Regions:
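Short, surface-exposed, charged amphipathic helix/loop patches that serve as local interaction elements
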Residues: 2-129
Length: 129
């Protein structure tokens, strides 16, 4: 994988998001970055007047999903808004999107190397036989 390869995770929602008389299930989630977190906080403050409290927290979560989603069915990107997700997304489908964000992060995570093999015997008696 090169730096230019986008990290994504695809999946399907269980209940879907209704838009223009159609239910949309297929999604592709990208890597959530600090820039998207910043954008989501800005959107939350603009919509709620604050970033504190339960309502603002829920709006922030939907805004972050909007900025992280690469695709949700055939919904045009400009129509994918926190308000749409608040109106249409079920808690179960939110969990699926959240699981996808975790899966994308795991793809980016450094793999843990196994302990190096020193090539030396494990005990002194192994050398005498």
């Amino acid at each position: 994988m090169t730096d230019k390869t986008p990290l994504t995770e695809s999946g399907e929602l269980e209940y879907g998001v209704a838009f223009n008389g159609e239910l949309h299930y297929d999604f592709e989630m990208g890597l959530s970055t600090m820039a998207q977190t910043y954008q989501a906080l800005d959107a939350t403050e603009a919509a709620c007047g604050t970033t504190e409290g339960a309502k603002a927290d829920l709006y922030y979560r939907m805004a972050l999903m909007v900025f992280t989603l690469r695709r949700l069915g055939t919904i045009p990107p400009e129509a994918l808004t926190p308000e749409l997700l608040l109106d249409e997304l079920t808690a179960e489908d939110y969990d699926r999107l959240l699981d996808a964000t975790i899966a994308v992060k795991k793809k980016r995570q450094r793999t843990k190397n196994a302990a190096p093999d020193s090539g030396s015997p494990s005990s002194p008696s192994d050398t005498t036989a």
